[in-house]
Amino acid sequence: MLSAMDVMIHSSSFLLPCDETCGTRYALVVLNQNLPRFTPLLWEHAKLRLCADGGANRIYDELPLFFPHEDPFVIRNRYKPDVIKGDMDSIRRDVLDFYVYWGTKVIDESHDQDTTDLDKCISYIRHSTLNQESSRLQILATGALGGRFDHEAGNLNVLYRYPDTRIVLLSDDCLIQLLPKTHRHEIHIHSSLQGPHCGLIPIGTPSANTTTSGLKWDLSNTEMRFGGLISTSNLVKEEIITVESDSDLLWTISIKKTGLPVQDHKP
């Protein structure tokens, strides 16, 4: 293993109240799957909010359900995306008209059928002013997991297309992110919010050599590949997990159902 590698530090501070995020600049992408219960909190963290095509339907329909004692119109005005981008084959006309009326930028890329809607949104963020300090940028994608498997596979592929950009795929149950082989990794665990179940998975390229610390079943110069050993259903044991590998790996960890604030809005 290459002990001289730079260390990349990972933290799910976006699951904490906004005053505890340590300067990270977040962008949020909402895809066309059920919204996690903590979506309003992610929204408050984000400096830029995009809906990928039908993700706008989810914001319009589902966010008011998180605030049953407030007027849905008020909620829809509070949570307006900055940009709607995609091939525009899923967004409803009434939803599109609503957000256009209230000033959301709409980018129709129906001419591009070679990239996914998530890919289109990531590209937009990478070319935005938010990416001027790229080391501090983290992109959060909700609705990236669940539903059709080919959609999930396409979203996982986006992580590999942009290994130099910190992207986290989120569902109500877990998160997934890429650990590039170019770095050693320190993953800081918020045990009240996430875990204990976790996994390290090589996709595309086998790992001949992976070493970890902080897991119940640590790896020590271990080979991992599909058709052989992969580290699934592992358990977090320490507050800091370290990972070093000769291959890009996917890191996944469960998100607990309790302990998370549903929203961080201050009227």
From Swiss-Prot:
GO terms for molecular function: ATP binding; kinase activity; thiamine binding; thiamine diphosphokinase activity. Pathway: Cofactor biosynthesis; thiamine diphosphate biosynthesis; thiamine diphosphate from thiamine: step 1/1. It is an enzyme of class 2 (transferase). InterPro entries: Thi_PPkinase, Thiamin_pyrophosphokinase_euk, Thiamin_PyroPKinase_B1-bd, TPK_B1-bd_sf, TPK_catalytic, TPK_catalytic_sf. Optimum temperature is 45 degrees Celsius. Gene3D superfamilies: Thiamin pyrophosphokinase, catalytic domain, Thiamin pyrophosphokinase, thiamin-binding domain. Its EC number is 2.7.6.2. The keyword Kinase applies. It is found in: Cytoplasm, Cytosol. GO terms for cellular component: cytosol. Its main location: cytoplasm. It catalyses: thiamine + ATP = thiamine diphosphate + AMP + H(+). GO terms for biological process: thiamine diphosphate biosynthetic process; thiamine metabolic process. Disruption phenotype: No visible phenotype under normal growth conditions. Tpk1 and tpk2 double mutants exhibit a seedling lethal phenotype. Expressed in leaves and at lower levels in flowers. Keywords: ATP-binding, Cytoplasm, Kinase, Nucleotide-binding, Transferase. Catalyzes the phosphorylation of thiamine to thiamine pyrophosphate (TPP). TPP is an active cofactor for enzymes involved in glycolysis and energy production. Plant leaves require high levels of TPP for photosynthesis and carbohydrate metabolism. Belongs to the thiamine pyrophosphokinase family. PANTHER family: THIAMIN PYROPHOSPHOKINASE, THIAMIN PYROPHOSPHOKINASE 1. This is Thiamine pyrophosphokinase 2. It comes from Arabidopsis thaliana.
